[in-house]
């Protein structure tokens, strides 16, 4: 079956072109994406405040000065029983706050990404789609699989020195796309298949998104703290159980996290571009060959129209037709069982 030109073009893109396509997708679809994703960000802020304000207030009320205690420990000064109990309680509460915060954040952000992933992928592939129907179709029973793996297992694994979390993220983040594809029977396996070989690209995409938001947020907060930051007494009055004002706390946190809200669509747009290109390459399989271009000493030819056959035995005097590696395009004069340039096996071509 003839592959569409859009899929071939997507498969041909370099990583730099993929990133540029992601930014282009962000700019073209920002108006449609910002409303649903901003709503999810605000929901995240509200849930975080209602779930953790009491715990944060209690932790602050313990009056534990961590810096002072650490200084005592460094000076080999024995802590009193009261100080030790307060420190233990403070650390346990802090860990609990961090875990709950990460859990809520991962679940809400996962749902947010799922809600627009199908729309973005179809827009990128220039298929007919609209945000309302795509948003509705995102909420099916398979979404619980994504929430469990990305929204729950990911924050749980963060407490295991981050390594399992990185592995889960790099291997299965494409599940936010594959779970909602009608032609995919095993979305986890499909997500892993497409992500295979793209682990570092996925991590680089995440880090790039993090750096951009971090820089813009830092500039914004430096201005925010100068003009809009309330006094500590006023803010504590909002938090205090006796005078708590949830409305002011929510408004304050929305303003403080405004950059995260406004740039919420960026990561899913970058990820969509990477997913589409990776999926195109995997779907085309060994039929895919890049357009003629040089990469150092390797030249990638245009796609061949005839099948490639590797004879198992050839006499020395027999002329052998040259062919190109279907993986890297390297010109091979003598048939081999593997590519001398990239090392890929050719055994499957004779199966």
Feature annotation, model-predicted:
Residues 8-11, 165:
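Alpha-helix initiation/capping motif
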Residues 35-56, 94-110, 145-169, 205-234, ...:
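Hydrophobic alpha-helical transmembrane segments in multi-pass membrane proteins
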Residues 79-82, 86-95, 99, 135-153:
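A conserved helix-loop-strand patch within extracytoplasmic ligand-binding domains
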Residues 2-4, 9, 63-71, 118, ...:
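Juxtamembrane transition segments at transmembrane-helix termini in multipass membrane proteins
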Residues 11-43, 132-157, 170-217, 245-249:
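Interfacial aromatic "cap" segments that immediately flank transmembrane helices
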Residues 56-91:
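Membrane-interface interhelical loops and short interface/amphipathic helices
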Residues 111-139:
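Hydrophobic transmembrane alpha-helix segments characteristic of membrane transport
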């Amino acid at each position: 079956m003839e592959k569409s030109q859009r899929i071939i073009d997507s498969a041909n893109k370099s990583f730099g072109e993929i990133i540029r396509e992601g930014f282009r997708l962000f700019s073209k679809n920002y108006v449609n994406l910002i409303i649903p994703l901003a709503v999810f960000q605000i929901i995240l802020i509200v849930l975080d405040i209602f779930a953790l304000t009491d715990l944060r207030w209690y932790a602050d009320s313990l009056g534990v000065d961590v810096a002072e205690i650490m200084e005592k420990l460094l000076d080999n000064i024995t802590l009193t029983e009261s100080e030790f109990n307060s420190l233990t309680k403070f650390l346990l509460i802090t860990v609990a706050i961090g875990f709950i915060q990460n859990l809520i954040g991962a679940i809400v952000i996962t749902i947010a990404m799922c809600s627009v992933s199908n729309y973005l992928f179809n827009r990128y592939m220039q298929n007919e789609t609209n945000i309302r129907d795509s948003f509705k179709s995102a909420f099916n029973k398979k979404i619980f699989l994504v929430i469990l793996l990305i929204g729950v297992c990911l924050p749980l694994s963060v407490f295991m020195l981050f390594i399992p979390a990185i592995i889960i993220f790099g291997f299965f983040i494409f599940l936010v796309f594959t779970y909602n594809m009608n032609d995919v029977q095993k979305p986890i396996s499909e997500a892993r298949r497409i992500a295979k070989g793209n682990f570092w690209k996925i991590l680089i995409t995440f880090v790039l998104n993090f750096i951009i938001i971090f820089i813009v947020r830092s500039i914004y907060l430096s201005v925010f703290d100068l003009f809009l930051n309330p006094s500590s007494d006023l803010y504590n009055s909002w938090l205090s159980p006796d005078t708590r004002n949830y409305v002011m706390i929510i408004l304050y946190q929305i303003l403080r996290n405004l950059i995260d809200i406004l740039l919420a669509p960026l990561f899913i747009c970058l990820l969509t571009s990477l997913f589409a290109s990776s999926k195109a390459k995997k779907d085309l399989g060994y039929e895919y060959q890049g357009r003629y271009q040089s990469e150092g000493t390797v030249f990638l030819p245009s796609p061949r129209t005839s099948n490639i056959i590797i004879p198992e035995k050839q006499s020395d005097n027999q002329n052998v037709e040259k062919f190109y590696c279907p993986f890297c395009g390297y010109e091979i004069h003598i048939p081999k069982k593997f590519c001398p340039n990239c090392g890929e096996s050719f055994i499957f071509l004779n199966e």
